[in-house]
């Protein structure tokens, strides 16, 4: 039986040409997660989708189909587009690439959908680096790979800002002396990440490295194209 979904909130993460006049879209939705859909004749001169299939625009989208590739139906605007420019636009592309690489099709991501929309708004108005770090943390949490930020792994004591902790993948953060050991982070930075408070530039730099370290384990050997262009 063909499954039909009517006017689901969505963002387009990616679009690519298909055949002579069509497009294949990667969508982010709250109740169906990542969805791949074929927009037939979307590039035709008289297409009903003309001007509607833009990235970073809140949409209401209908689709049908039983396979992994759905068939796009009606598309309506669901708010004003987020007008990203310059580095903010690159950040938006980075978010989209992360989601395409890490999300499975047809898994609901209600909170992540709202995190994504809030992040687009912050990219228009706010600090780019802090906004990206916050989204990366939220993404890891939603995927079940959130960092253990409540205490150190052995003593089970809360992080202290003036102490240092070595990150051990699959275990957590181990209290240590400040040294040349790899993957050592200040308690100050870990507390900032825990609270999603990124006002200190030195902590922000450490958090960026920690997020990259963690995400790389999920992404595998294939690098993100957008990461090469950012900062």
UniProtKB/Swiss-Prot annotation:
Keyword ATP-binding listed: no
Source organism of this protein record: Coxiella burnetii (strain RSA 493 / Nine Mile phase I)
Record-annotated membrane-spanning stretches: none
InterPro entries reported for this sequence: ARFGAP/RecO, DNA_rep/recomb_RecO_N, NA-bd_OB-fold, RecO, RecO_C
Name of protein: DNA repair protein RecO
Any Pfam family: RecO_N
GO biological process: DNA recombination; double-strand break repair
Record HAMAP family: RecO
Gene3D superfamilies named in the record: Nucleic acid-binding proteins, Recombination protein O, C-terminal domain
Keyword DNA repair assigned: yes
Top-level taxonomic group: Bacteria
Gene name per UniProt: recO
GO cellular component entries: bacterial nucleoid
Physiological role: Involved in DNA repair and RecF pathway recombination.
Keywords: DNA damage, DNA recombination, DNA repair
Similarity comment text for this entry: Belongs to the RecO family.
